[in-house]
Amino acid sequence: MKTEELYTMIQQKPVILDGATGSNLQKVGMKPGVCPEEWILENEDKLIDLQKSFVEAGTNILYAPTFSGNRVKLEEYGLADRAEEINKRLVGLSKRAAGDKALVAGDMTMTGVALEPVGPMKLEALIDIYKEQAKYLLEAGVDLFVVETMMSLAETRAAVIAIKEVCNLPVIASLTFQEDGRTLYGTDPVTAVVVLQSIGADI
């Protein structure tokens, strides 16, 4: 999908995004503390049925359940060596659910390891981690990317840079803001928009 096509789509009608996948999967048996990606691959029908219901309700863009599919998060469950397989299989499930009625976005989020100087993660290493996941998602056939539930503008920036180094697909980036209107690290929405637009985020 080209960025212009996404913009045209938005101009023509309201675009409805994915539903609450995680909480809905918990309602059908996914226990807290498990690796969501692994659980989904062991319960494929649960995900497909849920996402088909999203499509039937009018969803235009499904999020592949690759939210924490980066190798840092997967390593917490001893699954880092399966990152490629996991990401590609999960995209495949969402594509089955979408059929020809919805687009499928590669979904990415934080690694859980803070960037320097707050934490030990180096920027270059973080970009490489996100590039790896973005490459797997691209090869699996996603239509666009979503970087979501981010608490750090610096990490969001790293994810967008990584995706744009891998491909030219559209990128939707979003951050989580607290009651004071700022992220956990103190970033206000205007600053976030200016920074992310400057590096290629499309929405």
Protein language model annotation of sequence segments:
Residues 1-203:
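Domain-level signal for soluble alpha/beta catalytic cores
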